[in-house]
Amino acid sequence: MVIRPANVVVLGATKGMGRAVARRMAERGDRVFLLGRDLEELRLSAADLKSRSTGPYEVGIAQCDLQRPETFETALEQAETALGPLDIVVVTAAQFATQDRLEQDTGLAHRLLTVNFANTVMFCELARKRLIARGGGTLCVFSSVAGERGRKRVVLYGASKAGLSGYLEGLDHRYRHAGLVTVCVKPGFVTTSMTEGLPRPPFAGDADAVAKRVLDAIDRRKPVVYAPAAWAFVMFWIRLLPRFVMRRLDF
């Protein structure tokens, strides 16, 4: 169990799930450092967290863009300088686009695959090395239920998340003995800016409730967490469906 207050870095902290997770961590007294692309949005988020924090801590910020890998090392260095050795690194940042858009725009498809898999993994590798160097810590990364099976509506997005989930499972097997705890978050549909305009399916969740479940998984050192909880049951059965059935389903 992580000793409170923890030194926490959140990448993607200005919107949606990242903001919800950062808020909950600040409210319980953790020292939080925010990473994101937009400095003005980071400043606003930091001010919001400061007002919610139960501890006497400043909320630091640094620019970190998953489309620009050259920003990764500097951002983590700034976070560690401000906080000291890191206990928890949370990665929520990602890109989403519909399958139709991705098929029509190969440039967009390339960016999404690069950001969601290759660049996220490179950021995680840098974070992983820092956590292990200080004796261990928690790397919590948002993947998706879309990566569980190949599906018609999310072929490319799902592939990016399938790769990320596989990477996180491999880290768990390779470095658990070294003190690295990996938490792979597999959200279903969550109402955030990323899903704005999309039809709301059954079992949809809200960001704050999902954040609560994620923090519980971090504290319990769970390697995989589905959120909302109903998705664990849904995906259990989806994984069992034979391929000829999956071909007929339009989801």
Where are these regions (language model features)?
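Residue(s) in the substrate-gating loop at a strand-loop-helix junction
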Residues: 144
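Conserved mid-core segment of classical short-chain dehydrogenase/reductases
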Residues: 73, 94-110, 153
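Conserved glycine-rich cofactor-binding loop
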Residues: 14-15
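Rossmann-fold cofactor-recognition segment
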Residues: 52-70
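C-terminal helical subdomain
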Residues: 184, 199-236
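Active-site helix of classical SDR
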Residues: 124, 160
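Conserved glycine-rich Rossmann-like NAD(P)H-binding loop of the short-chain dehydrogenase/reductase
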Residues: 28-45
